[in-house]
Swiss-Prot record:
One of its GO terms (cellular component) is cell outer membrane. InterPro entries: Borrelia_lipo. This is Variable large protein 7. The keyword Signal applies.
Length: 369
């Protein structure tokens, strides 16, 4: 009998322990009061997240990521048009505008009951205005990128063996200016400078892939069928960050190639093209510059890549377009990453100033929040 009672007690103890663990896990999964389970922001609102005194600035950034989650991660495909990429940029710009509006509400609440003549001296208003200025800059240039395309597919390529077409000059300038200003806004906000690509067209002393640059030819001969694989190899040797760095370090007025490319040839010059002989004249050009040129040609109005064979053959238009799409996506991810890092830094700075201002104030009652 004692053994049976002891066994029953042991089972009860085990059951109680299991129930306790389950309850603890369940409680741990519940969002804290005033927070959402995903973003960490109050009701998923960016402005409310910034007003959570003592909370990490990460909460505000998560609220921003939640706000733009239906836009981030856009990936171009073979049937994606350049205008559809523009739609992505316009949507991202609109989300940056929404974030700015959320921030404005923080300042409006901070000014409630305050003499408006002193509003310019309100530290919360100042913090919000500084953050909004950066978001406004990003929004403007992101939306500018929304206007650089046309109805042709991303990576548009010649459907037969033949040269390509340079990107429209006005739209190429607009793309260059927008990317340059987005990166400038990032570095001004404390984001680490972009990595500069040092890899040449003969990566690590290996295969010489200079003929891959011929898919950017706009005159002379067209690339050979085997050259397209070399273009893909050039692209795979660099990161999107290195491509973006090469583009923004170009000169707005860099010209189409009139002589053999070298280590100083910019992404803008490669995007504008030239003869196949000049494009593939040496293996010293930077791979990031060639890849950046391919990405720009693939995204900007009237840009068309050269092909080495009939559309569906090896080295033909479809294969070339695949390289163009991959280059475009690498660049898009890099731009998106820069924007996210910039917003994160801006929100951290605003949060720090807002917390400092609120910490020096009298506690605010729940009814007045």
């Amino acid at each position: 009998m004692r053994k049976r009672i002891s066994a029953i007690i042991n089972k009860l103890n085990i059951s109680i322990i299991i129930m306790t663990v389950v309850l603890m896990i369940g409680c741990g999964q519940q969002p804290e009061a005033g927070k959402t389970g995903v973003s960490g922001g109050v009701n998923g609102n960016l402005g409310n997240s910034l007003m959570e005194l003592g909370r990490s600035a990460e909460n505000a950034f998560y609220a921003f990521i939640e706000l733009v989650s239906d836009v981030l991660g856009f990936t171009a495909k073979s049937d994606t048009t350049k205008q559809e990429v523009g739609g992505y940029f316009n949507s991202l710009g609109a989300k940056l505008g929404e974030a700015s509006n959320d921030l404005e509400q923080v300042a409006v609440k901070a000014e409630t009951g305050v003499d408006k003549s002193d509003s310019s001296k309100n530290p919360i208003r100042e913090a919000v205005n500084e953050a909004k200025e950066v978001l406004g800059t990003l929004k403007g240039y992101v939306e500018s990128l929304g206007t650089i395309g046309d109805s042709n597919p991303v990576g548009y390529a010649n459907n037969a063996a033949g040269s390509g077409t340079t990107a429209a000059d006005d739209e190429l300038r607009k793309a260059f200016k927008a990317l340059q200003e987005i990166v400038k806004a990032a570095t001004d906000a404390g984001v680490k400078a972009l990595k500069i690509g040092a890899t040449t067209l003969q990566a690590n002393g290996g295969a010489d892939n200079k003929e891959g640059a011929k898919i950017l030819a706009t005159s002379g001969g067209n690339p050979a069928a085997a050259d397209v694989a070399k273009a893909a190899a050039i692209l795979s040797s660099v990161s999107g960050e290195e491509m973006l760095s090469s583009i923004v370090k170009s000169g707005e007025n860099d010209a189409q190639l009139a002589a053999a490319a070298d280590g100083n040839t910019s992404a803008i010059s490669f995007a504008k093209g030239g003869s196949d002989a000049h494009l593939a004249g040496a293996n010293t050009p930077k791979a990031a510059a060639v890849a950046g040129g391919i990405a720009l040609r693939s995204l900007v109005k009237t840009g068309k890549l050269a092909a080495g064979a009939a559309d569906n053959a090896t080295g033909g238009g479809k294969e070339v377009q695949g390289v163009g799409v991959a280059a475009a996506n690498k660049l898009l991810r890099a731009v998106e990453d820069v924007i996210k890092k910039t917003v994160k830094n801006v929100l951290e700075k605003a949060k720090e100033k807002i917390d400092k201002a609120r910490g020096s104030q009298e506690p605010v009652s729940e009814s007045s929040k």
